[in-house]
Curated annotation (Swiss-Prot):
This is Phosphatidylinositol 5-phosphate 4-kinase type-2 gamma. The lineage of its organism: Eukaryota, Metazoa, Chordata, Craniata, Vertebrata. It comes from the Eukaryota. CDD domains: PIPKc_PIP5K2C. It is an enzyme of class 2 (transferase). SUPFAM superfamilies: SAICAR synthase-like. GO terms for biological process: 1-phosphatidyl-1D-myo-inositol 4,5-bisphosphate biosynthetic process; negative regulation of insulin receptor signaling pathway; positive regulation of autophagosome assembly. It comes from Mus musculus (Mouse). The gene is Pip4k2c. The modification Phosphoserine is found at S26, S349.
Length: 421
């Protein structure tokens, strides 16, 4: 796209999204909300500001074009770009020169639909208020203001891996009807500010947008070097590992039917990863203590969330959109407020798709959030070299983390099958 001097876009009002009901509900038509322009917040960080400006621009552009009847091979290679030079509008919000690129926009649009996430809700959840910076194992990690989406800064190699596996991933999501423990990839972007490229991957948050997690584990099924460091353990919410899980005699207390469904889904997902020669993935386990969660907490400081951006600064002037599926203006998690209040430990499974409540009569009243993470590592020459080095160090029979994809999968599934009471 040719260079241009343009004002920043505002996000269109939220429209579209899931219908009422609890459990795995399907979308139902509702009355339209009165549309209000949703302002993109003022970002102190130029990178975040450009990213959210770009997402608003992208969703506006997509809204002008009907979804394709079917995706073509070229859709998995496509991208949309915009370059802005000599930008003087709202200089406190955006740098004067920047570029934004969205990878495979029609593919991710289709994936969002298959994961029952409306584009307008996606936009509002990302752009209405500032995302929070949170701790990640590597790279930058942001969480949307409503805690439904995570934005992970990844490497160019990760983007290349995503590109090479995106067609297979999409086919798998179609085949399983979006019912999976894999990460729900919702958008992939490049942001260029001051001649530096940053790559952002947007996913659904595996944890709840309203139930806080009190304990967290990253489980790989390996026992070598799989204990949280002392530095990690003193954090408010440390990421504990396999040895910590065993040493604490931790167990997951869910019903037999839920366990059966979960393990069948996990096995199917892992078999898919083996086909792609992917390994080194983990099961992310978050535990919400219902008793602890029902205790009143002190209110924290109120964040400044007002935007300084004018509501009329629309890129290319697309109109605010009204969808046939009404949602509240708060984004992905917002519609829930129009239904009955949720009690302690209750959740909306249409939003908290990775959640399972503990069984009746379990010794602990808990909610578990379980999903697969770090699924981009393929078994290549680098991994083979690491495996050889670890074999020399620990011996061929040691429970080391770096093994062949088939071995990794078997060890992983065996370990996870034993985390349940």
């Amino acid at each position: 796209m040719a260079s241009s001097s343009v004002p920043p876009a505002t996000a269109p009002a939220a429209a579209g999204g899931p219908g009422p009901g609890f459990g795995f509900a399907s979308k139902t038509k509702k009355k339209h909300f009165v549309q209000q322009k949703v302002k993109v917040f003022r970002a102190a960080d130029p990178l975040v500001g450009v990213f959210l400006w770009g997402v608003a621009h992208s969703i506006n552009e997509l809204s002008q074009v009907p979804p394709p009847v079917m995706l073509l091979p070229d859709d998995f290679k496509a991208s949309s770009k915009i370059k802005v030079n000599n930008h003087f509008f709202h200089r406190e919000n955006l740098p004067s020169h920047f570029k934004f690129k969205e990878y495979c926009p029609q593919v991710f649009r289709n994936l969002r639909d298959r994961f029952a996430i409306d584009d307008h809700d996606y936009l509002v959840s990302l752009t209405r208020s500032p995302p929070s910076e949170t701790e990640g194992s590597d790279g930058r990690f942001l969480i949307s203001y409503d805690r439904t989406l995570v934005i992970k800064e990844v490497s160019s190699e990760d983007i290349a891996d995503m590109h090479s596996n995106l067609s297979n991933y999409h086919q798998y999501i179609v085949k399983c009807h979006g019912n999976t423990l894999l990460p729900q990839f919702l958008g992939m972007y490049r942001v260029s500010v001051e001649n530096e490229d940053s790559y952002m991957l947007v996913m659904r948050n595996m944890f709840s947008h309203r139930l806080p997690v009190h304990r967290k584990y990253d489980l790989k099924g390996s026992l070598v070097s799989r204990e949280a460091s002392d530095k990690e353990k003193v954090k408010e919410l440390p990421t504990l590992k396999d040895m910590d899980f065993l040493n604490k005699n931790q167990k997951v207390y869910i019903g037999e039917e839920e366990k059966k469904v979960f393990l069948e889904k996990l096995k199917r997902d892992v078999e898919f990863l083996v086909q792609l020669k992917i390994m080194d993935y983990s099961l992310l386990l978050g535990i919400h203590d219902i008793i602890r969660g029902s205790e009143p907490e002190e209110e924290g400081p109120v964040r400044e969330e007002e935007s300084e951006w004018d509501g009329d600064c629309n890129l290319a002037g697309p109109p605010a959109l009204v969808g046939s599926y009404g949602t509240s203006p708060e984004g992905i998690g917002g519609y829930i407020h129009s239904h009955r209040p949720l009690g302690p430990g209750e959740f909306e499974s249409f939003i908290d798709v990775y959640a399972i409540r503990s069984a009746e009569g379990a010794p602990q009243k808990e909610v578990y959030f379980m999903g697969l993470i770090d699924i981009l590592t393929q078994y290549d020459a680098k991994k083979k070299a690491a495996h050889a080095a670890k074999t020399v160090k620990h011996g061929a029979g040691a429970e080391i983390s770096t093994v062949h994809p088939e071995q990794y999968a078997k060890r992983f599934l065996d370990f996870i099958a034993n985390i349940f009471a």
